[in-house]
Amino acid sequence: MSLVNPHGKEKVLKPLLLTGEELTAEKARAQSFAQVRLSSRETGDLIMLGIGGFTPLTGFMGHDDWKGSVQDCRMADGTFWPIPITLSTSKEKADELSIGQEVALVDDESGELMGSMVIEEKYSIDKAFECQEVFKTTDPEHPGVLMVMNQGDVNLAGRVKVFSEGTFPTEFAGIYMTPAETRKMFEANGWSTVAAFQTRNPMHRSHEYLVKIAIEVCDGVLIHQLLGKLKPGDIPADVRKECINALMEKYFVKGTCIQGGYPLDMRYAGPREALLHALFRQNFGCSHLIVGRDHAGVGDYYGPFDAHHIFDQIPADALETKPLKIDWTFYCYKCDGMASMKTCPHTAEDRLNLSGTKLRKMLSEGEQVPEHFSRPEVLEILQRYYASLTQKVDIKLHSHAVGK
């Protein structure tokens, strides 16, 4: 059997990253272009366009694709796309630019020239409409809403040429991978069914349990962590990488899973982001996405299994990658092991509810972490990280984190 096809009608990866002489020539040309500065989110999106992670997109979305994606999870040509991929700038900057003009795309933080774009469209959007549809809220306390509300007032659309993957290939060597690379690894392992495990946390016992369930039913698992920006209080990628390596070395059969990483910032869009996670995992070659409790959620904005339900609401042919839905998992003292709501008959008093938020809060406040919460090797790395922090971040416990 072969791997799932890349997303889109043509079913082929479309990486937009230039190489060799073409890259040298286009970078030289772009030196004289007017510059458009990219936010961290936009830079991550551009890199995903570059490596083919956002196949079949060829650039940042125009108005009709933006509206279709926001309102119906479909672009103007009918391609399924659950979250808009857009580039914004100020009205003042947009007024200086004309349709058909080539612009240089520059990462605002590093100043690196990341790519170029031919402007095909300039348009304004209703930000509140986008937030309500995508995030199901316009609350500015929601980090994804804040991101959209703070972006420029004008969107620029057009085909892009990508020059760089930023620091990801060097900073996360051996972890950061392109879709072509993961597909090659899966094929070398003889895998055709591969489950992706999305994570922005070091893996506690529930995460380990979810991955092991997937290993039982698939050929292998891609533990695929987000390498872009998170909200304050979340644990940085280099620490997560060390934790996952320790866990894989001590508690997983070799050859059953691969640790990888991708360059996006977290959007915290809950159910909609779960769909995007499945979509680009299809491009990476994964047949399944593990969807547990409160996937891609934040606070109490989403129900614990809204991300399960949304997959039942999209057309059956929207994605080849399917959800591997797993119920609430926990450690049960009476079962003497990890269990779920489907397998454990005992009461809440017998269970230790596990969540990344709860673990971060305990570590941040120097509390004793219960024995069955995390593997000791992982805990040791996390305790060392928290001991090194000079500034404490206040972490709020939402209801899902405490088992409600």
From Swiss-Prot:
It holds the Pfam family ATP-sulfurylase. It is an enzyme of class 2 (transferase). Keywords: ATP-binding, Nucleotide-binding, Nucleotidyltransferase, Transferase. Its EC number is 2.7.7.4. Pathway: Sulfur metabolism; hydrogen sulfide biosynthesis; sulfite from sulfate: step 1/3. It catalyses: sulfate + ATP + H(+) = adenosine 5'-phosphosulfate + diphosphate. GO terms for biological process: hydrogen sulfide biosynthetic process; sulfate assimilation. Belongs to the sulfate adenylyltransferase family. PANTHER family: PTHR43509, SULFATE ADENYLYLTRANSFERASE. This is Sulfate adenylyltransferase. The lineage of its organism: Bacteria, Pseudomonadati, Chlorobiota, Chlorobiia, Chlorobiales. The gene is sat.
